[in-house]
């Protein structure tokens, strides 16, 4: 159930950013070629459940993923877990926001029942684990 929900959310994020010039078949191929990687990345961020401004490991995972795909990464001195990933030069400029922070006090397993997860004190009640991974996946898809 969680895996199909992850795919649906990540794919719906991608629809917002995909150029119209691609055929449906080539888009499916591009999206599917990265599916497993970004589903796993979302689940890793879920497991880490780092609260805002302390999501160092989650930030590192996303940065490394984008760097491996040829993006230039710039970190920000005033917010150490935030970063800008750039690919290419010139126009058009497309900006994609990704969030990956967890919320304190909402630890939850991936089951539909109320089950605290690994005694974590934080959790992803708002789906930011999907938002962060989905935004990175979208950027990789449209580059």
Language-model segments: residues:
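Bacterial N-terminal signal peptides that target proteins for export
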Residues: 1-9
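Sec/Tat signal peptide C-region and signal peptidase I cleavage site
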Residues: 19-23
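Acidic/His- and Gly-rich active-site-bordering loop/insert found
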Residues: 24-124, 133-136, 141-142
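Bacterial N-terminal signal peptides
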Residues: 10-17
């Amino acid at each position: 159930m969680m895996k199909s929900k992850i795919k649906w959310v990540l794919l719906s994020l991608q629809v917002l950013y995909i150029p119209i010039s691609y055929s449906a078949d080539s888009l499916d191929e591009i999206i599917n070629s990265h599916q497993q990687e970004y589903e796993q990345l979302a689940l890793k961020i879920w497991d880490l459940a780092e609260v805002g401004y302390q999501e160092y490991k989650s930030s590192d995972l996303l940065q490394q993923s984008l760097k491996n795909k040829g993006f230039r990464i710039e970190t920000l001195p005033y917010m150490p877990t935030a970063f800008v990933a750039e690919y290419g030069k010139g126009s058009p400029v497309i900006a994609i926001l990704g969030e990956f922070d967890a919320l304190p006090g909402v630890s939850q397993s991936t089951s539909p029942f109320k089950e605290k997860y690994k005694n974590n004190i934080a959790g992803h009640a708002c789906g930011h684990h999907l938002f962060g991974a989905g935004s990175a996946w979208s950027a990789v898809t449209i580059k």
